[in-house]
Amino acid sequence: MTTNAPAGSSAAAGSSRRLQQTQNQVDEVVDIMRVNVDKVLERDQKLSELDDRADALQAGASQFETSAAKLKRKYWWKNCKMWAIGITVVVIIIIIIVVWSISS
């Protein structure tokens, strides 16, 4: 029995050592997973902020498009008015020339 006691003791020590190694590995994996979860949460927050910025940019682009269309329409009408004024002036000048040439 004396010979079995040290063998049992060394087997228990080896088992304890393996258990400790396994526990250390588990602790290491748990730490890595905590870091990964933190990174995922940070990524989620950044994606959420990016999504908010994209929504704001889309709203700004839509507003810009509307304003640009209104401005285009405004200047198109201004251009039409200028053409109408120019044509009217030319017609009046032609009428004056014709009336002046007939009356002379």
Swiss-Prot record:
GO terms for biological process: positive regulation of receptor recycling; protein transport; retrograde transport, endosome to Golgi; SNARE complex assembly; substrate adhesion-dependent cell spreading; vesicle fusion; vesicle-mediated transport. There is a cross-link at K70, K72, K81 (Glycyl lysine isopeptide (Lys-Gly) (interchain with G-Cter in ubiquitin)). It is found in: Early endosome membrane; Recycling endosome membrane; Synapse, Synaptosome. Keywords: Coiled coil, Endosome, Isopeptide bond, Membrane, Protein transport, Synapse, Synaptosome, Transmembrane, Transmembrane helix, Transport, Ubl conjugation. Residues 1-23 are annotated as: Disordered. GO terms for molecular function: SNAP receptor activity; syntaxin-1 binding. Pfam families: Synaptobrevin (PF00957). Residues 18-78 form the v-SNARE coiled-coil homology domain. Ubiquitinated by RNF167 at Lys-70, Lys-72 and Lys-81, regulating the recycling endosome pathway. The chain crosses the membrane at residues 82-102. One of its GO terms (cellular component) is early endosome membrane. It is a single-pass type IV membrane protein. Residues 103-104 are vesicular. Residues 1-81 are cytoplasmic. Residues 7-16 have a biased composition (Low complexity). Belongs to the synaptobrevin family. SNARE involved in vesicular transport from the late endosomes to the trans-Golgi network. Interacts with POPDC1 (via the C-terminus cytoplasmic tail). Interacts with BCAP31; involved in VAMP3 export from the endoplasmic reticulum. Interacts with BAIAP3; this interaction is increased in the presence of calcium. Interacts with PICALM. This is Vesicle-associated membrane protein 3. It comes from Bos taurus (Bovine). The lineage of its organism: Eukaryota, Metazoa, Chordata, Craniata, Vertebrata.
